């Protein structure tokens, strides 16, 4: 299957209305491993509505997620697609409930060469009802074995340098074996998270 660069870049995803509340905040927090210590006030505030509930900041990742690239015209084999890096910029804190408009866009597709991946770079703004941008989510998707389509090869982002100082804070969260199954409840229905046979592809 050959990746169709022109078709992907010409695609204009529709805006996605988002409505969420306390339940979604709690499910997201449980899906990233919070609540493993059910008596820790630092975790309870994300998983219990009577503990001063807060939305975990990275919840912006799943709000208004545009889904996978399943249109056959894109020439992308969905079985070979995995999530890459994600950057979240919060312009203001996420409320524990609200209505937003997700505005996704495809920024670029980078060619890593024949036999390698194509990196699909996306961005989306989460826009409040008053028109202000609440968060911007930049992400990369790796389409394994889709390189060699003749696209750009030099625009790979440079990773941030590792700080040479001691960390300001350390967070150690265990990840239970069923965490991917819980995370799917946020709307990411990629079979990779639940189907062992699919994960072997």
Give, region by region, the residue ranges found by the protein language model.
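A conserved, well-ordered hydrophobic junction motif at loop->secondary-structure transitions
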Residues: 41-58, 169-171, 178-201
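Short, functional N-terminal and low-complexity linear motifs
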Residues: 69-71, 147-151, 183-190
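Solvent-exposed, non-transmembrane amphipathic alpha-helical segments
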Residues: 28, 45-49, 124-126, 154, ...
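HotDog/MaoC-like acyl-thioester-processing domains
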Residues: 1-14, 64, 81-174
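Hydrophobic, proline/glycine-rich low-complexity stretches
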Residues: 1-99
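A broadly conserved detector of short glycine/acidic/proline-rich loop/turn motifs that flank catalytic sites
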Residues: 24, 31-32, 174-177, 186
């Amino acid at each position: 299957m050959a990746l169709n660069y022109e078709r992907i870049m010409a695609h204009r995803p529709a805006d996605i209305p988002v409505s969420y509340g306390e339940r979604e905040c709690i499910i997201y927090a449980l899906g990233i491993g919070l609540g493993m210590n059910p008596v820790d006030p630092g975790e309870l505030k994300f998983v219990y509505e009577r503990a001063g509930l807060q939305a975990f900041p990275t919840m912006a990742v799943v709000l208004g997620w545009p889904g996978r690239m399943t249109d056959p015209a894109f020439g992308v084999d969905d079985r070979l697609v995995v999530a890459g890096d994600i950057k979240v910029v919060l312009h203001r804190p996420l409320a524990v409930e609200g209505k937003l408009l997700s505005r996704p866009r495809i920024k670029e597709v980078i060619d890593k060469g024949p036999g390698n991946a194509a990196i699909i770079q996306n961005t989306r703004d989460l826009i409040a009802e008053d028109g202000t941008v609440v968060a911007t989510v930049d992400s990369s998707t790796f389409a394994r074995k889709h390189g060699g389509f003749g696209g750009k090869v030099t625009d790979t982002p440079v990773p941030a340098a590792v700080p040479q100082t001691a960390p300001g804070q350390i967070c150690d969260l265990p990840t239970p074996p069923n965490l991917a199954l819980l995370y799917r409840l946020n709307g990411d229905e990629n079979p990779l998270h639940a189907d062992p046979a699919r994960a072997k592809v």
